[in-house]
Amino acid sequence: MEDYKAFLDEKMSKVLLSLDNEYKTLRTGRISSNIFDKIFIQYHGQRTPITQVSSIRIPEARLVVIQPWDKTILNKIEQAILNSDLSMNPSSDGSVIRIKVPALTSERRQDIVKHAKKIAEEHKISTRNIRQDLNNKVKKQEKESEITEDSLKRILDDIQKSTDIYIKKIDAILESKIQEIMEV
């Protein structure tokens, strides 16, 4: 069961990667095309992210230009953005969509921070679930006399230490994201 460390690191690293990907879609003080990653339209009968059917450019700090590759979906993209939780008002000229991005209000920043904390907590729960699953596997091995009681205690301590390290990493990522969100 010495491979438990590699298993644990692999699983918990995936949790950190997932957290990072989730945070890329949160709107902060700086506009990023990543905030459109979770906006979908129906295209050829499939739910498709708008990032896969258009080019998204940010020519100015507060301006986003979305150019669909197929002009027939322009209205679908515009409607999807309006229906999203991004609080943006797109305008189209028939070939491109322009979005003038307003500065985030203090209230909106607080809402985004709450959402970021919720996402972090979900990832902490995932980390703890990984720990629990591995603890159960190790305890089962001890019951089946595959490992000694001393080994069990040592392994459980190692698992807990690794879990604590990853929880601290999640907290550090959260704090960094909060600073980015609150930056004016």
Swiss-Prot record:
* Single biological process term from Gene Ontology: translational termination
Q: Which UniProt keywords apply?
A: Cytoplasm, Protein biosynthesis
Q: What is its main location?
A: cytoplasm
- What InterPro entries does this protein's entry cite? Ribosome_recyc_fac, Ribosome_recyc_fac_dom, RRF_sf
MF terms (GO), sorted A to Z: ribosomal large subunit binding
CDD domains from the entry? RRF
According to the UniProt record, one GO cellular component term is:
cytoplasm
Which Pfam families does the UniProt entry name for this protein? RRF
Subcellular location(s) per record: Cytoplasm
Q: Which domain of life is it from?
A: Bacteria
What this chain does, per the entry, is described as: Responsible for the release of ribosomes from messenger RNA at the termination of protein biosynthesis. May increase the efficiency of translation by recycling ribosomes from one round of translation to another.
Into which family does the record put it?
Belongs to the RRF family.
Q: Which NCBIfam families match?
A: frr (TIGR00496)
Q: What is this protein called?
A: Ribosome-recycling factor
Biological source species: Borreliella burgdorferi (strain ZS7) (Borrelia burgdorferi)
Query: Which taxonomic lineage is given here?
Result: Bacteria, Pseudomonadati, Spirochaetota, Spirochaetia, Spirochaetales
- The record's gene field reads frr
